[in-house]
């Protein structure tokens, strides 16, 4: 679908991996907005009380989500099966790396929002920009900087410092972290259920 090997850090993939309409659906499903899956950049802290029928008492209520959407960059973890295309890309990356892969969906709604800053991750990351534009800075042997547009991807190896800055009002990207545990063989089932 996207790649056979990683010869460069940046490349072009197919567009429309994930849309804001699909994100809207996830944000309205409580299991995707619990405090273990939905992560907010910065020091945001919100408290809320669940309602009578909730089985997951730690789901963000809509009123709190609306507040943070206008202030922070956010991501939702455990989205490797958010749609068929994401599931397929996880499968392809698992074949390449021989390790489990997940998808974290990152989004923001204003330029230059509070983000995750310059940081490094313990896992290899393959990031696909779905909508909007972002500035990507990678500090490997030398600093690499690029403006990404929808369909562009960047591969960032583990322990390499990087920073993502939204430069359009709306930004949506999918980050595919590869398990950093050498003996991790806990792969998700990638068969797509059809009815």
Language-model features, listed with the residues they occupy:
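Active-site region of the double-stranded beta-helix
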Residues: 36, 41-152, 160-195
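Conserved beta-strand-loop-short alpha-helix elements that form
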Residues: 155
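An N-terminal JmjN-like helical accessory module and its immediate linker preceding a catalytic domain
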Residues: 1-35
